[in-house]
Amino acid sequence: ITDNNQIQLGIRDKNIEYAVSETGDVIAFVQQGELWCFDRVNNKIVQVFSFLGAEGINARDNWDQHDIKIARVDEAGSIDFVVYGYMNRGDHEGEVGTAVYHYDGLVHTIEEEIFIPSDVSYEILKAQMGQLMYVNEKGTFYLIMDQKLYSIDTDKRTPEVLVKDLKESCYKVSESNQYFAWVDSDKEYKSDVIHLMNLKNASVYDIKAKKGAYILPLGFIDEDFIYGAAKKDKVMVAAAGNTVFPMKNLTIMDTSENSHSILKTYEPSRGSIGFISVEDYTITVSYTHLTLPTIR
């Protein structure tokens, strides 16, 4: 419902899946398993995708084991989005998987670009979805599903697995989803190379550790990449089975325009860094038993 150029969604949780065009004139949002597009300039709202029939009372239609993630919306109201989980109807009715769609806002048509079946439940897909989803200007669609990074050529409608066996501790994604940093899963906590991919142009830059050190991706501040280094002889498996990775320093790298210049290096005067947390533009660096001053 639109009222005074606003959308009233009624009583629902605060976590709304939505995306806004560059100028802010077009808003795509998900409401009760349906995708909608709102044109603020013309005060018009369009239903883009729904499994519901005209009556909306069919048990098959109302089976809510699916969800929608929006990748991109433009000024014409065209939307790239993903439907994942149990497919209530259509060509893949009864299957579980991920479908990539493109909605053309000018002619109001929707086209399935690819469907990737999955043997995991909707709940597992939901936990994985949203870790990375990006569409570049060439129309290449990237997403993480089933512990794999997929590259999907939407013209050829073919998926390619770029990285497999992903572990959450082995990769990080920038806020815009444009940059993806990872170490090979078989070298978790013992890698001397971090791969940094710019999904805008599919270029990969390898960050190499100094002699005698392992490196690990830690996160991003906007598009600036943060990674830590630990001495090889200090990395060990504790009695509880967890790996101790005591970092001797942190590095913040500029990724803009593929410059890869070092913006800042932080090395504590004593001891080692146990872990970090990133919030807004602040990195909180912590020892195992002692919190250090924040880096801004």
Q: Over which residues does each language-model region extend?
A:
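Beta-propeller fold detector
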Residues: V46-L52, I110-I116, V161-K164, Y205-A209, ...
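Short, conserved, GDST-rich strand-edge loop motifs in beta-rich repeat architectures
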Residues: I1, Y84-E95, K231-F245
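Beta-propeller blade signature
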Residues: E95-L106, H195-L199, F245-S256
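Surface-exposed loop and turn segments in beta-propeller and other repeat-based domains
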Residues: T2-Q8, F49-N62, E112-I124, Y266-S272
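Conserved small/polar residues in nucleotide/adenosyl-binding loops
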Residues: T288-T294
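Repeated scaffold domains used in trafficking and secretory/extracellular systems
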Residues: D13-Y18, N58-A71, V120-M133, K167-V173, ...
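Short, solvent-exposed loop/turn segments at conserved positions within beta-propeller repeat blades
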Residues: V30, D91-V96, L143-I144, K187-S191, ...
